[in-house]
From Swiss-Prot:
It holds the Pfam family RNA_binding. SUPFAM superfamilies: RL5-like (SSF55282). It comes from Saccharolobus islandicus (strain L.S.2.15 / Lassen #1) (Sulfolobus islandicus). This is UPF0201 protein LS215_1276. HAMAP family: UPF0201 (MF_01112).
Length: 145
């Protein structure tokens, strides 16, 4: 079973449509939920297929950041889940920038959670090892089981 979930705060100074647009640069979601936490809206976007990450897959190659992406993705594996964060303001202009902490993105980071039976298989598809910036392999997208 596959579940991809993206969570982002929408602060009072932000436009929810701009945050959705920033996320859409990297992720095609099937379902959207919003909940309120005080004055902050929390967007929760979900998909049940790894195909929802095809834009993310393409951007990693276009920006030539496979090595750093692999590091962040591998570091984020816990059990059958991969968790990582990206900079919200960079995402708003279509640039993918990983962050280690929510504090590195002044308006809050965009948080990704990918649940898959074998998370390393997903990492190998999204961000394979490289030699001199060239991927050592190009795995097909893992099946949505």
């Amino acid at each position: 079973m596959v579940k991809v979930m993206v969570v982002a705060e929408v602060r009072p100074s932000e436009d929810v449509n701009k945050v959705l647009s920033a996320i859409s640069n990297f992720f095609d979601f099937e379902k959207t939920n919003t909940r309120k936490e005080g004055i902050i809206d929390i967007l929760v976007l979900e998909a049940r297929t790894l195909k929802s990450l095809l834009k993310f897959h393409r951007v990693l190659r276009n920006e030539r950041i496979l090595d750093s992406a692999r590091k962040y993705l591998m570091k984020g594996i816990e059990g059958n889940t991969i968790a990582f964060m990206i900079h919200k303001q960079a995402a708003a202009v279509g640039v993918l920038s990983f962050v280690d902490s929510d504090k590195e993105s002044p308006l809050g980071a965009i948080k990704f959670y990918i649940e898959y039976q074998n998370p390393k298989e997903v990492v190998d598809w999204l961000a394979p090892r490289t030699a001199h910036g060239v991927p050592l392999w190009d795995n097909p997208i893992p099946p949505d089981v």
